[in-house]
Amino acid sequence: MTYEIGDRLKIGGYFCTIKFIGVIKPWPSVKAYGVEWDDHSRGKHSGTIDDIHYFDVQIPNSGSFLKESKIKSPGVRRITFYEALSEKYGGSSNNINDLSIGNKRVEGLGFDELNARNKNYKKLRKIALRDSDVAILFQNQDELNRVIQNCVNVKDLDLSLNLFTNINSLCEFIEPLKNLESLNISQNKLLSGWDNLKEYDLSHIKTLRLSSCGLSYKHIGKLLKSFRTLKMLDLSYNNLTSAGIQNFENEIPCTLEELNISGNNLISFPLFPKNLTLKGLNVSNNQISRAPSIAIYSVESLDITDNKFKERSLIDDLNKTFPSLKNIHLSGNEFNYNGNYINVEEQATFYEVLARFDRVMVLNGSICDVKTRREAEMFFVSKVMNNELSYDTNLPRWSSLIKSYEIDMSKLSFNNERETRQSLVLKIKIRAGKKPSSDLDYWVLPSFTVRYVKSVICRKLNFDILNVKLFHENSEGMINEIKYNFRPISDFNVVNGDIIHVSSPVNNKSIQKVNSPS
């Protein structure tokens, strides 16, 4: 097989791109191939050896030279789509005759075997050829016609992690496959064919996955002219920037319902057309630090995991700009309050974040029922009214909350006087030893079960929940064990300021002393 500059190879399980073919000074008698490795750690230099520069690389020290014997070893393959299809779905045959025309091997099949194989192909609805060394989609029109004939019923095609590079050939290949709806070409380096890319009728494709293809917005803009009725588009981990992606407003199909642009270089949300029907948006693993400037009414699911959101008030901005939001992932952002980092997974913060949104019922993957949401809202309202949480009470969300819980704001003042507070939550002290100096303050709802309170305490103190007992001490110093894991703590007359003693094998003796009669 003859190789050209720009060809992709997989050698020993590692992918690379040929950047140079010729003779180099250290190997004057053999043909050398300069390659750039996808796994940059395998490189040894940047295309320069003995002070002679032979080729350029995108990432410093990601290049190396290989002898032709290494490149043309039996384990290095570049095959056609039809060959890969035959290997995986064609089955074995005892009626194959090996013929040779020049240097090309031709597979000869009996008519019965050929008809049976073609019949099997036509039954296929999904073809999965991920990592199958496919470098050539078709060699000529006859081969393309054979693919069209045999893959007529295919709806889902996975060609991810292969070796083809020409985008024009790819579009020409899939255009006649009119039943094809889902196409995955992720992790292919689409390096060529962009300059003469035609407009194709690829309106039958509804799902397109282009993750990790090294694409810029310039490439995406050209490609979307052919994919005009997409419902799902995955552009994650490419080379998209906020400057380029702002043009999405003019390029993105209005039919799109789900968009994944995670893992790029975005510092802001893209602009979208007003008539967009987008339901799901994933912008995780970017550098975004603020909400969109224009409301996006259609989005119901949003993933902003691992971005640069820092201020708590940005949660309220997201609620305003995504008014239909029902599902949000926002872990990995350094939300803070008074300079302190907030862990969204902590129960109190989880409740607060949930309550700040009008309609969210799934937070960081946790599905919340109506009861949980109501508890979160009660907790949040009480914290705000107790001046324990800074919140803009002029927001429409606050008006909605006080209306929902029939709170007469004219009878309340926001200060620290206990008599003005509404006791929707209880502040208790957790004591795991004899000394009050070790007490931990904890906010609970009266509806929290004993088991839930126990689990939170054990998580904070690193205790084993199976070996822990809780004891309630009221304001008069009376101590009683809290039993019945699935009853609410309100059943045990726990009120503000009470102490919950924790008994575990580590501190069991000290707790027994607390419980001893005087």
From Swiss-Prot:
Coarse class of the protein's main subcellular location: cytoplasm
Annotated localization: Cytoplasm, Cytoskeleton
Annotated keywords: Chaperone, Cytoplasm, Cytoskeleton, Leucine-rich repeat, Microtubule, Repeat
Presence of the UniProt keyword Mitochondrion in the record: no
A GO-annotated cellular component: cytoplasm
Biological process per Gene Ontology, one example term: protein folding
Gene Ontology MF, one: alpha-tubulin binding
Function comment: Required for viability in the absence of the kinesin-related CIN8 mitotic motor. Seems to be involved in the assembly of alpha-tubulin.
Name of protein: Protein PAC2
